[in-house]
Amino acid sequence: MLDFNRLEQYRENNRIEAKKALGGLPKSIWETYSAFANTLGGVILLGVIETADKTFDSVNLPNPDSLIREFWRIINNPLKVSVNILAGKDVYVEEVDGDRIIVIKVPRADRADKPVYVDNDIRNTYR
């Protein structure tokens, strides 16, 4: 579990990915979702940047609820993502130093759901 009061202690790795997301959902979110689902799972942080020294810092998302609605709409579209393995509890808003960020906890996909791929093309399977 991440300690959001100490966000600056984390760095991107094969289980944590930071995305600024101020202009909406980043296109790369689906590749990250696929990669996490097809491996050991991971956490996507929207409204978080990686600084020059590779630590994390939050940026305030002006309308996180709208981004979450858009996320659910897209992830439930089988033409975009082969399978949605998330539950409601896996996507939520967290406050960090007065900034609102979105946390997306992606579990490891069950064998029956693998591979998880994007854009209705099994060649778009990420690990």
Q: Locations of the language-model features?
A:
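Conserved N-terminal catalytic/coupling substructures associated with nucleotide/phosphate chemistry
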Residues: M1-R127
